[in-house]
Amino acid sequence: MATASFDSAPGASRALPAIEKAPEVTALSTLPGRKASLVGLTREGLKQALIGIGVPERETRMRVSQIWHWLYVRGAREFSEMTNVGKGLKAQLAEHFTLDRPEVVTEQVSRDGTRKWLLRMAPTGAHDHNRGAEIECVYIPGDDRGTLCVSSQVGCTLTCSFCHTGTQRLVRNLSTAEIVSQLVVARDALGDFTGQMPGKDGGEVGRLVTNIVFMGMGEPLYNLDAVIDAIAVMSDQEGLALSRRRITVSTSGVVPQIERLGLEANAMLAISLHAVRDELRDELVPLNRKYPIAQLLEACRNYPGLSNARRITFEYVMLKGVNDSDADARALVRLLKGIPAKINLIPFNPWPGSKYECSDWERIERFSEFVFNAGYASPVRTPRGRDILAACGQLKSETEKLRARARMMLEEGMGAEAVYADQVD
């Protein structure tokens, strides 16, 4: 069953600065008559849910603490599991709410152990044809960590020319609960909640998911309210208990929101740079036409908490004959002078219809060596999950295809039900 969010739509509580207006797309309210899920809620959202069913406000702090533990430490799927919650309250909760997660439409496992989930969110009405928006998230296991790549939007507005997600139009922002629920789904699938596997004590030690990267579908800083609240839930030490130093938010360069991200989320920052000249970055990352490289790097220099211990990661996709020359490497080092940084070199991951090729391995190594010798860590990101289109730049949900088919059928006088009856998962 898909998750129905009780959280208010992103952007409802905190206005963006006038200089930067996010796209007018939000997570719409739950369908009438549908129970909302408590999974993914903030503490305040959970408090308001309890008040809404008649729990006295003086009791809410204790009740929120109890339920929070079952949601985010134990991973409860039924209210009956909540042994320290009174029978009457459990009955009330079951009457009004669920503990549903997003529906797992498909799970693919790569030869290298990477997992990709296609998740369907709760339906919100005509906006998504009563079916529910679809997004992807990816789990990447490593020797000393496990990284979950989460999405912040359904689709993307940025149309970066090398990115598969950029070929899918933006449908809407995800709510806080929909972002957090991606971590809940991953922990469910991996048996990563306390009590599900031996040695799980609620802390980071022994966890399979140790790191979160906002590098899935969408531009996180265009949905910053929801992202900040999601990070607060993920890093709450009485719940999901991730360290904020293990949460990284990647942006293509929404300059006016970068400082606020640092002040309110205190997360690690990654920049999708990919070029050292404005004319090339204008093509690769069209947002550069609004916020050129000089403005972006100035915002990076002023990022709250920036230090050698909290470096900014600059992502640089290696495109054959496009941005991979010795001159590009020298220019990159000059641009980043004075910024505590590391540079992630990303071998381009091909996807159907792309016009780019990955740089030769020898060229990538030469580029990396030049940057390293200039004093910057320059790891080459090992491509993971390429065989299931789960690697960097390859994510794309089925939503865009569904919307196109819906428009076509509606033009032919067919209802939305026909679209989904015809869709084979």
Swiss-Prot record:
Reaction proceeds by a ping-pong mechanism involving intermediate methylation of a conserved cysteine residue. It holds the Pfam family RlmN_N. This is Dual-specificity RNA methyltransferase RlmN. It comes from the Bacteria. Binds 1 [4Fe-4S] cluster. The cluster is coordinated with 3 cysteines and an exchangeable S-adenosyl-L-methionine. GO terms for cellular component: cytoplasm. Its EC number is 2.1.1.192. CDD domains: Radical_SAM. It is found in: Cytoplasm. [4Fe-4S] cluster binds at residues 156, 160, 163. It comes from Methylorubrum populi (strain ATCC BAA-705 / NCIMB 13946 / BJ001). Its main location: cytoplasm.
